[in-house]
Amino acid sequence: SAASDVYKRQGYDMWLGPYGNWGSRKYLLASLDQSLKRMGLDYVDIFYHHRMDPETPLEETMGALDQAVKSGKALYAGLSNYDGATMKKACAILRELHCPFVINQNRYSIFDRTIEKNGLKAAAKEEGVGIITFSPLEQGILTDRYLNGIPEDSRVKTDGRFLNKERLTSDKIEKARALNELAKERGESLARMALKWVRKDDAVTSVLIGASRPEQI
């Protein structure tokens, strides 16, 4: 079997004990093998390292991505949640290895502009590497979902791991309401305006919407 437009991210817990997390060669390659087996695939299109590892040398992590590509288990390498300076170092290592590094995956929205502050957005442009952003709607805050309270079936009440009452602050809601009024003046929904804002710069290659139900699309 073969993958079509499939990607895999590694950088969080895969198993208990040593090398079960972060960015070591053992972790990345073993977790990729496990994931391919579970998915019933021979390869993924993009294999991401999910986050910077403060303990493992960058050369080891990038070497593992290179090995994944050259072994035929991934077509391209990607990075997720890196800052600009570290991404540039990683890019130089991968270029020297002749490993195709094509994409960064980072959080980006009207409310979260970290990639502008940490240099990732500018560095990606300089290196000619794309950015695919996630949480462009700030987990539903930049839609009409929470403008008038918290619905019973929302992730705030049913899950709460990534969006909870502590993060859904009154300040954010007030800002979202103000943005919603601006969107109305423009003749569009808040969600549409928020997505257009993320895509306004050609540094952003694509956007992961992150819908939880088909009707949200």
Q: Which stretches of residues belong to each language-model region?
A:
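Active-site mouth loops of central-metabolism enzymes
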Residues: 13-29, 50, 55
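Short, small-residue-biased leader/transition segments that mark boundaries at the very start
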Residues: 1-7
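Active-site groove signature of glycoside hydrolases
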Residues: 36-56
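Hydrophobic packing within well-folded, soluble alpha/beta domains
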Residues: 6, 35, 44-47, 65, ...
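A short acidic, helix-capping loop that chelates divalent metal ions and anchors anionic groups
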Residues: 12-18, 142, 216
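Beta/alpha (TIM)-barrel catalytic core signal, keyed to glycine-rich beta->alpha loops juxtaposed to Asp/Glu
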Residues: 56-216
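Short amphipathic alpha-helices and their capping/turn segments at secondary-structure boundaries
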Residues: 4, 31-37, 119-128
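Short, acidic/polar
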Residues: 23-39, 87-91
